[in-house]
Amino acid sequence: MIKLTQEEQKYLLDSIRIIPDFPKKGIIFRDITTLLNNKEALNFLLKHLKERYKDYNLDFIAGTESRGFIFASMICAKLNLPFVPIRKPGKLPFETFSCEYDLEYGSDKVELHKDAFKNIQNARVLLVDDLIATGGTAIASYELIQKAGAKCVEACFLMNLKDLNGANKLEKLTSVYSVLEI
């Protein structure tokens, strides 16, 4: 499997702005907009992901709202694959599957159209998001893909916040690849 060298990871990491104490004190926010408007770094990332996934025999790429949409759509364009959105509740106009997950204070849901994978049983799906932290959204998204009769062959994240252990939880269900380990 194709992975980046430490030097290549540093190159990408250096293209992401760090904002301390956002959205609240004690949080270190990773602002991907600086990567998105750096065409050299963005093209480097997309070339890497295209190389990694070109031989996975994927049928679809699913992205989670909202920043997962950005990366998933671009990977779809590079691999000539259809995009499937996994959205917050009430945003999809047709019949949906939904999955609830826990937050630090409360819970939330994600939804997926029931026919998102065109009723192709065991369709091979790559799940994409910008970041995995505690794993709640990612695990719920994985479960939605399964509910729709498809198979999540890997979950791909730009960043994994290692200390929050989400990738380790998700790895019990599917393969996980994080471009950057933070």
Swiss-Prot record:
Swiss-Prot/TrEMBL GO biological process terms: adenine salvage; AMP salvage; purine ribonucleoside salvage
SS bond partners: none
Keyword tags: Cytoplasm, Glycosyltransferase, Purine salvage, Transferase
Gene Ontology, cellular component aspect: cytoplasm
Localization of this protein: Cytoplasm
SUPFAM superfamilies per the UniProt record, alphabetical: PRTase-like (SSF53271)
Family: Belongs to the purine/pyrimidine phosphoribosyltransferase family.
Subunit structure: Homodimer.
Protein name: Adenine phosphoribosyltransferase
Gene source species: Campylobacter jejuni subsp. doylei (strain ATCC BAA-1458 / RM4099 / 269.97)
Gene expressing this chain: apt
